[in-house]
Regions:
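Basic, helix-initiating cap at the start of DNA-binding domains
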Residues: 1-26, 30-42, 56-59
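Short hydrophobic/aromatic patch on the recognition helix
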Residues: 42-51
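Alpha-helical DNA-contacting segments of helix-turn-helix folds
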Residues: 51, 55-64
Length: 64
């Protein structure tokens, strides 16, 4: 796997893990995309590059 592909995969995993943690602690409705991005140490724009909307994180969870 190329370095960029590896970094992209790791970033997506980091966003996903941060979202799951926030959903558990705060609830889905109370969690914003901005909070997920901050917890994952990425910009809000980067979050939306990986997930077009917050619900897409849950769809990703369902596919795993």
């Amino acid at each position: 796997m190329a370095v960029r592909e590896y970094q992209k995969k790791r970033r997506r995993e980091r966003i996903f893990r941060a979202a799951m943690e926030l959903f558990r602690n705060r609830g889905f409705q109370e969690t914003t995309a901005t909070e997920i991005a901050k917890a994952a140490h990425v910009s809000r724009g980067t979050f939306f590059n990986y997930y077009p909307y917050k619900e897409a994180v849950l769809l990703d969870y369902g596919s795993q």
